[in-house]
A protein has these predicted regions:
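Alpha/beta-hydrolase active-site loop
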Residues: 205-226
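Short, surface-exposed "cap/lid" segments of acyl-processing enzymes
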Residues: 119-123, 129-200
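Short beta-strand/loop motif that positions the catalytic acidic residue
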Residues: 378, 384-386, 390
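Alpha/beta-hydrolase-fold enzymes
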Residues: 2-95, 99, 225, 229, ...
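Gly/Ala-rich beta-loop-alpha elbow adjacent to hydrolase catalytic centers
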Residues: 235-240, 244
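Catalytic histidine-centered segment of alpha/beta-hydrolase-like enzymes
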Residues: 392-395, 412, 416-431
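Low-complexity, highly charged intrinsically disordered N-terminal segments
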Residues: 62, 66-147, 175
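Short alpha-helix in the alpha/beta-hydrolase fold that links the catalytic acid
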Residues: 380, 394-403
Length: 444
């Protein structure tokens, strides 16, 4: 009897979902909320058990142990495929409901307004505490920045930094004392960088080929024209590393050295929460409804990985005296974290499908435009930089490139920090980036 009733209810729910998008949305929301709250409850329970058993040690160490227990349990639970699938179903039902109500155009108009407002703020945001630079006219919807220096470059080959499409480029030039740009500039490099700007709704049809082939090519050719160099070195950060890899595999004649910085290459090895959720998402529906992927959706995804830590980090940080420099750096990082730009729709669709779902890049089967990307074509010097504590791009997802390329001159640097720490930690600027600069100088 109970089994029969369960089957009847399942059939009823399925029928209602198919016939009514409201029910579909409601059921998917309830399912995801139930699984997500169960994960929070499980993590809280484990943290409480840790508290009961942590009788010795200082209050600070006990708190650290409890937080670690909560974080580890929550990450394990949130990385479960069933929860990831539930989240993807919920987002998909939400997208379909938005499409049904005609929110597509309303959303596009809202994000265009946001884009124009952001453009007004960009001169202020991009100049305070940044290394002086000038924007150079190029073909394409992006800016090529040339960082100014009072000293002439010591190395013949210029360096082009290829930024990510997810977050803003200025994490590499956050503050003078933790600026990768300034660090490498002091080591004698002539540095250029791509600023992809804030996309608008009519940019949604720009493709991966547009960025990885055309725009990077335009930037490379402009740098060559300005400097008189026949080649450039590329440094690709995160998804910018994907662009740099793709470009180098098809235009190696223009590239002297390739540096990859926290770049996802081999997703099958180990999936973080974000990578697992991303692989489960229906990118097609999201792009079809919204065009570009909203920046706030990206921010929300990062927040719900651990909402407790997100709330506690502020009172915990200010629980002890801080210098003005420390406070400035803290808020500079927070500003960058939530300054997520919308992701170009077609680029997102392509990367999610070919890299995160099918893992085609490392298999040499990824298609960009008319090209099949073969990493074995890359034979120039390559440096791969990873953070051993990176919870966005785990070490195993990046290290595979060492064996995937055809280069004989290649090096892996494993540094004990996280994704953002590679860019802004004092330890990285004292040890990591001088080592990167030394490696590059010997080949420039």
């Amino acid at each position: 009897m109970a089994l029969s009733l369960t089957l009847q209810m399942t059939a009823f729910n399925k029928k209602m979902e198919e016939s009514n998008p409201y029910f579909d949305y409601a059921f998917k929301w309830i399912d995801f909320a139930t699984k997500y709250n169960s994960a929070l409850l499980d993590a809280s329970s484990k943290a409480f058990e840790t508290f009961l058993s942590a009788r010795k040690g200082t209050a600070q160490n006990i708190e650290k142990t409890i937080r670690s227990s909560f974080d580890t349990t929550l990450r394990d639970d949130l990385n479960d495929d069933a929860l990831a699938s539930s989240m993807a179903d919920y987002v998909d039902s939400w997208a379909k409901l938005c499409d049904l109500f005609g929110y597509k155009q309303i959303t596009a108009n809202f994000y265009d307004f946001f884009s124009y407002a952001n453009i007004i703020l960009e001169p202020l945001r991009d100049n305070i505490n940044r290394t002086p630079s000038e924007a150079i006219d190029t073909k394409g919807r992006f800016d090529l920045l040339h960082y100014k220096s009072d000293l002439p470059p010591e190395h013949k080959t210029p360096l082009l930094v290829v930024g990510s499409l997810i977050n803003r480029y200025y994490i590499l030039d956050l503050l003078p004392n933790v600026s990768i740009i300034k660090n490498l500039q002091r080591q004698g490099f002539d540095i250029y960088a791509t600023d992809w700007g804030t996309p608008k709704s009519f940019d949604k049809d720009l493709t991966l080929e547009t960025y990885a082939e055309e725009y990077v090519e335009n930037a490379v050719e402009k740098v060559k024209e300005i400097t008189g160099s026949d080649k450039v070195s590329l440094l690709g950060y995160c998804w910018g590393g994907l662009f740099a890899l793709i470009y180098t595999s098809t235009h190696q004649e223009n590239v002297k050295n390739l540096i990859l910085h926290a770049t996802p290459i081999d997703i099958d090895k180990e999936k973080t929460i974000i990578e697992n959720w991303t692989a489960h998402l229906n990118a097609d529906d999201l792009v079809d409804v919204f065009g570009n992927i909203p920046g706030w959706l990206i921010n929300l995804t990062f927040l719900i990985r651990n909402p407790v830590e997100a709330m506690l980090k502020y009172p915990r940080y200010f629980s002890e005296p801080r210098s003005l420099d420390e406070i400035t750096q803290f808020f500079a990082i927070e500003t960058w974290l939530y300054d997520s730009r919308p992701i170009i729709g077609e680029v997102y669709r392509d990367i999610i499908d070919q890299v995160y779902r099918k893992n085609l890049l490392v298999k040499n089967k990824m298609i960009v435009g008319s090209d099949i990307i073969n990493l074995k074509n890359i034979t120039i010097p390559l440096l791969d930089i990873i953070g051993t504590k990176d919870d966005l791009v785990p070490p195993s997802a990046s290290t595979s490139v060492i064996n995937a390329v055809g280069s004989t001159d290649k090096k892996l640097i494993e540094f004990p920090t996280g994704h953002v720490g590679l860019c802004i930690s004092n330890m990285a600027h004292e040890k990591l980036w001088p080592e990167v600069g030394k490696w590059l100088a010997q080949r420039s």
